[in-house]
Amino acid sequence: MVVLLFLLVILLCPDSTNGNKLRKMLQKREAVEPSKPIVSVKESKANEFLNSLKRPKRQLWDRTRPEVQQWYQQFLYMGFDEAKYEDDMSYWKNQGRGGSEYYGGFHQHHYDEDAAIGPRNPYTYRHGAGVNYDDY
């Protein structure tokens, strides 16, 4: 009882520096009403600026550009063959796609089947083949 009375006295009596603590806790805080932000640019001007922003196009290897034509001529002069390049790319991209081939599909055999040491994978070895058919 004494403790309760002591707490009430502490909370209700005004403090010398802060005033009445209980009253301060219970009274509503008065917040300043938010004012409209001041905009320095009109909406039409802002929209005009934002609409004018366009993403720059990527630098594509456009063959109509003269420097790309020059590079391409240099590649051809150095021995670049576009058809062979496309064939090689399609071959290497499709290497792992089909697994239904008889020789495994993924491995291209560069070994000689009549050599003393054969392929490491026994399932890819053609039993009884006396000819390296990969050469044909």
Curated annotation (Swiss-Prot):
Gene Ontology terms describing biological process: anaphase-promoting complex-dependent catabolic process; cellular senescence; central nervous system development; G1 to G0 transition; regulation of cell population proliferation
Q: Where is the signal peptide?
A: 1-19
In its UniProt entry, what is this protein called? Answer: Augurin
Family note: Belongs to the augurin family.
Gene assigned in the entry:
ecrg4
Supply the alphabetized keyword list: Cell membrane, Cleavage on pair of basic residues, Cytoplasm, Membrane, Secreted, Signal
Per the UniProt entry, the propeptide covers 20-56, 121-136
Query: Function, please?
Result: Probable hormone that may attenuate cell proliferation and induce senescence in the central nervous system.
Report one GO cellular component: cytoplasm
- State if Cytoplasm is listed as a keyword: yes
Establish whether keyword Secreted is in the entry. Answer: yes
